Regions:
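Terminal leader/tail segments of proteins
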Residues: 315-316, 320-321
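Structured aminoacyl-transfer and RNA-binding surfaces used for tRNA recognition/handling
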Residues: 1-315
């Protein structure tokens, strides 16, 4: 099966289960979890069912294409269902059947593997899904994001499309065996990008510049999340300017949080990516590592807290009644 067909089939399957098929986020992330449609939307009471492909960058995982199934940039297919359906495991097994796997004929195992992302203050209980001895999916019930409780708990399913294609076709290498479609190979689409970024990540990236960038992105994220914005009911917009209007201001549940959460979160993601580049360059000591992780987590948490403000009225009304 080609990568393209794999993605099309997953899109069709999860759309039929009620998921909106979204697009990849355009900021460097280390996993589909960091896409704001997961990282922010798993918080709060509102139902949220989405699926999307996300290119994921993990600079330290590069192997100059010498490893047939490991790279610094690869794809994840992410599914979020909130609240988690009671039959989510059956839905997942159905997705494997839709891809052409015979789950009854293959050795499919759910291996307990509780998940944690320290830099995002995120975690949950879950499993790795293994088929015939190879990991194909991470399955998580989110309990925390940004150090805040996820209520209701939502289900996250993260597929590795490249590996699924190889297993389905009984092949072994991204770089020699995998096709993107009928006319373009995975190697043609990804090889030069992968090789050149490996050289940059491990040999060329300026650590002095990266340390400065981390500080700059961190400070800008702090400044942006603390910037006062107001809702202008006349114009129907958020603004930093004065608002003079006789129209009532809608509740926060309609206008969203009165803060620039998404721009501040983008900057937090940039901090995370810069940290990962520094880690690949070997510029982060063991003692520094915890400090940098805490700094990234602080930025993510600040964004999550502001995002949650839109639900305060709802919570207070519920308590009053």
């Amino acid at each position: 099966m080609t990568m393209q067909e794999m993605i099309f089939r997953l899109n069709d399957y999860w759309a039929a289960q009620g998921c909106a098929i979204l697009q990849p986020y355009d900021v460097e992330v280390g996993a589909g979890t960091k896409h704001p449609s997961t990282a922010l939307r798993v918080l709060g009471p509102n139902p949220w069912n989405v699926a999307y492909v996300q290119p994921s960058r993990r600079p330290a995982d590069g192997r100059y294409t010498r490893n047939p199934q490991r790279s610094q940039r690869y794809y994840q297919y992410q599914v979020i269902m909130k609240p988690s359906p009671d039959n989510i495991v059956d839905l997942y097994m159905g997705s494997l059947d839709a891809l052409g796997f015979d789950t009854a004929a293959n050795d499919v195992r759910l291996v307990e593997d509780d998940w944690e992302d320290q830099a995002a203050g995120a975690g949950g209980v879950g499993w790795e899904v293994w088929m015939n001895g190879a990991e194909i999916t991470q399955f998580t019930f989110f309990q925390q994001m940004g150090g805040l409780e996820c209520n209701p708990v939502c289900a996250e399913i993260t597929y590795g499309p490249e590996r699924l294609c190889l297993i389905l076709d009984k092949k072994s290498s991204f770089w020699t065996d995998l096709d993107w479609n009928e006319t373009v190979t995975y190697r043609q689409a990804e090889f030069q990008l992968e090789m050149q970024h490996n050289v940059y990540n491990f040999e060329v990236a300026s650590t002095d510049m990266l340390f400065r960038l981390f500080d700059m992105f961190e400070e800008e994220s702090k400044r942006v999340i603390d910037t006062e914005v107001r809702w202008d009911p006349e114009q129907g917009i958020l603004t930093t300017g004065p608002v003079i209007s006789s129209l009532p201001v809608p509740p926060l549940t309609e206008t969203g949080p009165m803060a620039l959460v998404y721009p501040a979160f983008d900057l937090a993601l940039k901090c995370s990516h810069v940290f990962n580049l520094l880690d690949a360059r070997g510029a982060i000591s063991v003692t520094q590592r915890a400090t940098f992780i805490n700094r990234v987590r602080g930025r993510v948490r600040a964004c999550c807290l502001k995002h949650m403000e839109q639900f305060k009225e709802e919570v207070l009304v519920g308590k009053a009644s």
